[in-house]
Amino acid sequence: MTLSHNKSPDLRVVKTHKAIREAFIILLSEQEYNDIAIQAILERAKVNRATFYKYYSGKGDLARQMIDDFKQEVSQLFQDRLNADSQMLQMIMENHSQKMFERRQQMLALWKIRTQHHNLYHDMFLMGKQNFIELAKKQKATDYLTAEAIDYQATMMATIFMASLKYYFEKDLPLPKKLPVDWQQMLDIIKS
């Protein structure tokens, strides 16, 4: 966003970005990404073409910027998880779960964009996988697990995490606090 003299952002610019992005999210919730025309975004956001192109080179650029912004937020959540000590972990996880729930409509809409250049769902999967690998290193799991075992576990953890987000958020429900217990119960059932 454009800053005027290194002070706070121009409120008109902030409102314009917000209107365009909200319009795009609404359209994504109603139709497929490839079916959305710039004109539909303009009409929904109530901005003219020149204003749109002042900030975005096209629909793909809008998607890229929104996905990049969202990925920065998710990256911070994963970083906070990695840096949390055991005493703060529960509070941090509940806080982050709430933040993700508040952004669920945007997340679900952006997940619908699956192109060669834009795929937030896959990007979040990879971020979750990498976070698990970093946690394994931090907890010295690399001392007793092979790299292949850690890669497998990271892949499975990212898969179940993303599927859980999708499952609950599509039902308009927050992630339950007992989610790890649910996962453990699944393992218990398999072992029985």
Segments (PLM) and residue ranges:
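N-terminal intrinsically disordered/low-complexity leader segments
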Residues: M1-V13
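Generic hydrophobic, amphipathic alpha-helix propensity
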Residues: R12-F24, I41, M66-F70
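Short hydrophobic clusters on alpha-helical segments that form packing/core surfaces
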Residues: T16, I20-L28, M100, G128
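Helix-turn-helix
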Residues: L27-D61
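Hydrophobic alpha-helical connector segments
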Residues: F78-Q106
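Amphipathic alpha-helical packing segments from all-alpha helical-bundle domains
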Residues: T115-T142, E148-T159
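C-terminal peripheral helix-coil segments that are non-catalytic and often amphipathic
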Residues: K137, A158, K166, E170-S192
